[in-house]
């Protein structure tokens, strides 16, 4: 079986004038034969926020190999911004994210010169008024398993403050769910994640590693805060209808029952972007058809 071939590519643009289009999302749904691209544009017209969608020409056949998700904390709008700015920046919190199984997903968040250099820390992941396009992965019968990679583990007493706090936050969230075991820290995963983080250029563009692991990315959060932001997507998850949703992929990877190990890396970018965090998971989560068995309800 193959991984469900789904990638979502989002770019969010914030300018001082907030001229239309304010937010653009592009969703690629890769089936066995081809990739269909749907572009959604969120814009403000006569004081009203509107969304339009357009199906673009199919792209070439995709062969993604890994699971990857990302989350960006957007810059805060200046105090003089109009109410339309608030609407658009609220949309950015959820739309500037990437979820999927991909080797080449990219998220770009561009801040204008008039944008504040501080970052908004997300406290909720509820869906904004500006809608985004959601695709459901093509059905598969893939059995969850990671690539054949041995992961050396560390005892909690050997961990750095960053590793200890991120692992503890993951396990705190997992403990809230029925029959969901704690994760152990993997030095192999952490080394992979840190190597990738060290090469990040702090540009505000998030590009997934395309490696063999599950992957969550965040920009503008420290380690524990990134885990909190990912987990807060639980508010959008429908336990009565388990499955894929573009705005719950971070949450489902954090609590994925079959995942046993995690390792994370961090790079301090400073300025507008703050910290860049990447967490790798083994075995990877978010397999189509396995949500009911791996995303348990609250205890």
Curated annotation (Swiss-Prot):
GO terms for biological process: fatty acid transport; sexual reproduction; sterol transport. O-glycosylated. The lineage of its organism: Eukaryota, Fungi, Dikarya, Ascomycota, Saccharomycotina. Residues 1-19 form the signal peptide. Disulfide bonds: none annotated. Transmembrane segments: none annotated. Residues 103-157 are annotated as: Disordered. Keywords: Glycoprotein, Lipid transport, Lipid-binding, Secreted, Signal, Transport. InterPro entries: Allrgn_V5/Tpx1_CS, CAP_dom, CAP_sf, CRISP-related. It comes from Saccharomyces cerevisiae (strain ATCC 204508 / S288c) (Baker's yeast). One of its GO terms (cellular component) is extracellular space. It is found in: Secreted. The SCP domain is necessary and sufficient for lipid export and sterol-binding. Residues 167-281 form the SCP domain. Secreted protein required for efficient export of lipids such as acetylated sterols. Acts in detoxification of hydrophobic compounds. The keyword Signal applies. Belongs to the CRISP family. The keyword Glycoprotein applies. SMART domains: SCP (SM00198). Present with 556 molecules/cell in log phase SD medium. Its main location: secreted. Pfam families: CAP (PF00188). One of its GO terms (molecular function) is cholesterol binding. The gene is PRY1. This is Protein PRY1.
